[in-house]
């Protein structure tokens, strides 16, 4: 099997982002986005998804974190799609429910080629530290749009904002890990009855 490694550069008037993903990694992460909470969440994806992630970003943080947060999501989604290639042999679907203390979040995803986000997180506070919790949805939407995945997030329990968000990223990581794994029984075929994704 060829290495499933990809790099993406995104440069706009608002941000300059470089990202590299290795889908068959060991969970190594180097995240320097200038948004500490986002770095922490990217570390969850790497650690629990066993995806090596290298990302650096310079953005207009003097305005707020929105552009950097969204553009990192865009670059992540584009890089994921590139690393997956034609998707031959992948499992395609993934689901996982992750607890973090009182919080419980379930993620179900399909690397279908059809972008759709069903967002069911109810985060009770506007901020976690300096991070605007509205940006969680913006990150996931950017990933979905640019990787063309279907993503459902459901919160079954949780009262602490940090716990809810982190549980969602851990569940996303584990679901993504299941979906990108190569199924040897597929023998390199596409996981679709249509023969196309």
From Swiss-Prot:
It comes from the Bacteria. Its main location: cytoplasm. Pathway: Amino-acid biosynthesis; L-histidine biosynthesis; L-histidine from 5-phospho-alpha-D-ribose 1-diphosphate: step 6/9. One of its GO terms (cellular component) is cytoplasm. It is found in: Cytoplasm. It catalyses: D-erythro-1-(imidazol-4-yl)glycerol 3-phosphate = 3-(imidazol-4-yl)-2-oxopropyl phosphate + H2O. Keywords: Amino-acid biosynthesis, Cytoplasm, Histidine biosynthesis, Lyase. Its EC number is 4.2.1.19. Signal peptide: none annotated. InterPro entries: IGPD_sf, ImidazoleglycerolP_deHydtase, ImidazoleglycerP_deHydtase_CS, Ribosomal_Su5_D2-typ_SF. One of its GO terms (biological process) is L-histidine biosynthetic process. One of its GO terms (molecular function) is imidazoleglycerol-phosphate dehydratase activity. Gene3D superfamilies: Imidazole glycerol phosphate dehydratase, domain 1. PANTHER family: IMIDAZOLEGLYCEROL-PHOSPHATE DEHYDRATASE (PTHR23133:SF2), IMIDAZOLEGLYCEROL-PHOSPHATE DEHYDRATASE HIS7 (PTHR23133). Belongs to the imidazoleglycerol-phosphate dehydratase family. This is Imidazoleglycerol-phosphate dehydratase.
């Amino acid at each position: 099997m060829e290495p499933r490694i990809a790099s993406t550069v995104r440069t706009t008037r608002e941000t300059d982002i470089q990202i590299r993903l290795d889908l068959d990694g060991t969970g190594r992460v180097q995240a320097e986005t200038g948004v500490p909470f986002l770095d922490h969440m990217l570390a969850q994806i790497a650690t629990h998804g066993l995806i090596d992630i290298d990302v650096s970003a310079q953005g207009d943080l003097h305005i707020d974190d929105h552009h950097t947060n969204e553009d990192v999501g865009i670059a992540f989604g584009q890089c994921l799609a590139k690393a997956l290639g034609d998707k031959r042999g992948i499992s395609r679907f993934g689901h996982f429910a992750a607890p973090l203390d009182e919080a419980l979040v379930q993620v179900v995803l399909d690397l279908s080629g059809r972008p759709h986000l069903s967002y069911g997180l109810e985060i009770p506070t506007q901020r976690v530290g300096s991070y605007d919790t509205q940006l969680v949805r913006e990150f996931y939407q950017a990933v979905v749009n640019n990787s063309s995945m279907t993503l459902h997030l459901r919160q079954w329990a949780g009262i602490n904002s940090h716990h809810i968000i982190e549980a969602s990223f851990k569940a996303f990581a584990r679901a993504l890990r299941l979906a990108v794994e190569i199924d040897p029984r597929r023998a390199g075929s596409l996981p679709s009855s249509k023969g196309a994704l």
